Amino acid sequence: MAKKILVIDDSALMRRVLCDIIDSDIRFQVTDRAKDGLEAFDLLSRNSYDAVVLDVNMPRMNGLQLLQELRKYKIPARVMMASTDTKEGAKTTLDALELGALDFVHKPDSAVDCRGENFRREFLRTLNVVANSKLPTFAAEEKLSEEKGTVKEMMKIINHHPVSVSGSKIVAIASSTGGPKS
């Protein structure tokens, strides 16, 4: 069964190009389209999708604002950013990833370049990864936020009390052998 995809872009031409690319692959099917974040928010609050392809610059509600609203209302979505602004290391890209986007592709400036094989291959590869990833949950994020608060409280206590009673100095080394579970 094909993965259900929502495409959000203010340009009708770009929506058409992205939908054509997605629908050309039997693994995916565009089931809905939106021209801005407000339309998309309405769709996402009523429907579930295997992946969401999201532009950044749009009227009424841009892509970053939509990500903020999804987080605020705890609406889970597997989001892939596709914008001329999303380049590796760009502030917009980092902001989107911090707000919950799972991955990104740099969308060429022209529809002609978007129809090129290199973009098509990269776009579909990224979409496949996003559509098959674990749906983000907000419980893990809340737990991490609580843990950060606990660490901050411990640091206040440690920094508040004098350390050396005997006059001896010690060196403590801490190490982590793992990270968050994937």
Predicted feature residues:
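Strand-loop microenvironment adjacent to phosphate/nucleotide-handling motifs in alpha/beta enzyme folds
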Residues: 1-182
